[in-house]
Amino acid sequence: MNNLEAILRLKTIDAAKKLLGHFLVSKYNNKILIGKIVETEAYLYNDPACHSYSNRTKRNSMMYAQAGTSYVYFTYGMHYCFNVVTADVGIGEAILIRALEPIAGIEQMQLNRSKTKLMDLCSGPAKLTQALNINLKDNGINLLDKDSSILLRYNNDLINEIDIVQTQRIGISKAKDMPYRFYIKDNIFVSKK
């Protein structure tokens, strides 16, 4: 078991904190695009804001896969959101990746987003999926497999617990008071402070 696999087997809230600082990698157009995870939100099976709360559907079926599987969904008729499945198979929990700090492949990210401002490339769930060219083709990918087109990469430079801000989730209408959003303090690439 690698370190990322161990993180994703933690309780989802703990995993959402521990994923901060690690890398999301996209292999696109013969380029490697890398972003450091700087903001996450946890979604639990008993959480009214979680897609698996009511029941299993075709759309949310990947939430029930093994930890480390990608769960990508289309929202508002125009955006994709990228999640990392956590917990045991059949539970239905995931972590929404809300923001990344661009690390490598920045020129391609700028082309993908039609934006040049670095701070605006990946500072939100829809922005980062556009920058890394993540869409429904990436739903159900094993993010722990080094040969996957989208994967998680471990960062040995771990984030200290005192540098993690915990707050309410944003951009949702149900259970928005739950303190399940986490971000790296003072990081300029976070979507909202």
From Swiss-Prot:
Pfam families: Pur_DNA_glyco (PF02245). SUPFAM superfamilies: FMT C-terminal domain-like (SSF50486). The keyword DNA damage applies. The keyword Flavoprotein does not apply. InterPro entries: Formyl_transferase-like_C_sf, MPG, MPG_sf. GO terms for molecular function: alkylbase DNA N-glycosylase activity; DNA binding. It is an enzyme of class 3 (hydrolase). GO terms for biological process: base-excision repair. Belongs to the DNA glycosylase MPG family. HAMAP family: 3MGH. This is Putative 3-methyladenine DNA glycosylase. It comes from Francisella tularensis subsp. tularensis (strain SCHU S4 / Schu 4).
